[in-house]
A protein has these predicted regions:
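Domain-level signature for soluble enzymes in the chorismate/prephenate branch of the shikimate pathway
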Residues: 1-318
Length: 318
């Protein structure tokens, strides 16, 4: 009868050697993949440089770069050999490939003295220093905070939130103040609907507390165009997006945001009514401490086609 020890399976020494060999092979594959992505980034940077020299704004150039779609539409002055190559290879990119590609692309663009900024993707628009809001204790407090950033603010009151939104949408006012969040941080669905229908942006937000209450409301400064706050020290900055649920895998987008240094501040689902039937959206607010969102914007305009930036803003403390 065999001893118990003879029935045991004792892994041979070759097992550890196999593991090392597999790890080395995996590392080699990763290096090869990075080389492939670097080649793609070089081709893409050439493509974008040509578009830039033809006078195309970065926001349009990155949209044309589209690695997910056919190369049927191409700018006349672009390097026509580059785009089909990128389009063909882009269909095989994994979620991680996409983030690495954008990082490499940013490096290649910098070598060509092309350094996109947030304002290239979300062009700021000059607005009248005319404010409007529905007068109440909280709105008065919010106005005192927001007005500090302007040279000659003027004000008129609106009878309703809808009237305030219409004043901005129609150009009678440059900014309106709206209650964005209830006490406890709950977003007001009616405000999200107004912003969606009128295609307005968030320029800034601030908490307001009324008569010394511990939990306050959050008011937003709303405008027709983007207002890009400067990156200052370690201050928090926020990027807010709205995208249809079918636009892209949410986990992939959030992983990319984290890769580029942005953390999730808030996510909620919205049911918004437009000109046609209601659609389901994600409302996503991302936070970055003392840094910009340039790489993430490059990613979004390259790989996420159906989304709406609502604004880059700071949270002003009253």
């Amino acid at each position: 009868m065999k001893g118990f020890e003879e029935d045991l399976f004792l892994p041979p020494q070759v097992l550890s050697e196999n593991i090392r060999a597999i790890a080395a092979h995996q590392s080699l594959l990763e290096e090869r993949r990075i080389c492939e992505l670097a080649e793609m980034a070089a081709a893409a940077s050439d493509y974008l440089k040509t578009l830039s020299e033809d006078g195309m704004p970065p926001v349009d150039a990155f949209s044309l770069l589209s690695l997910e779609e056919d190369a049927a539409v191409i700018h006349e002055g672009a390097l026509e050999a580059a785009h089909p190559y990128l389009s063909a290879h882009g269909k095989n990119l994994s979620a991680m490939d996409k983030t690495v590609f954008i990082s490499l692309l940013a490096d290649r663009l910098a070598e060509k003295k092309l350094c996109p900024e947030e304002a290239d993707f979300l062009p700021p628009a000059a607005a009248k220093e005319i404010f409007t809001y529905v007068k109440n204790l909280y709105a008065d407090e919010a106005y005192d905070v927001f007005a500090q950033g302007f040279d000659d603010p003027r004000l008129f009151y609106s009878e309703s939130l809808k009237d305030a939104v219409s004043a901005v949408a129609e150009g009678r006012a440059g900014y309106c103040l709206l209650p964005l969040e209830e006490k406890g941080g709950i977003r007001l669905a009616s405000i999200s609907q107004m912003l969606y229908r009128s295609d307005l942006r968030i320029a800034s937000v601030t908490p307001v507390y009324g008569y010394g209450e511990e939990t306050g409301l959050t008011y937003a400064l709303i405008s027709r165009g983007f207002c890009i706050p400067p990156v200052e020290g370690e201050d928090d900055r926020y990027l807010e997006l709205r995208l249809p649920k079918e636009s892209c895998p949410l986990s992939e987008l959030l992983s990319a945001a984290e890769f580029f240094g942005a953390l999730v501040y808030r996510i909620q689902t919205l049911q918004l009514e437009g000109e046609s039937e209601p659609r389901s959206f994600y409302s996503i607010v991302l936070r970055a401490e003392g840094r910009d969102f340039v790489l993430l914007l490059m990613y979004l305009f390259t790989f996420v086609k159906d989304f709406s930036p609502i604004g880059i803003y700071s949270n002003l403390e009253a």
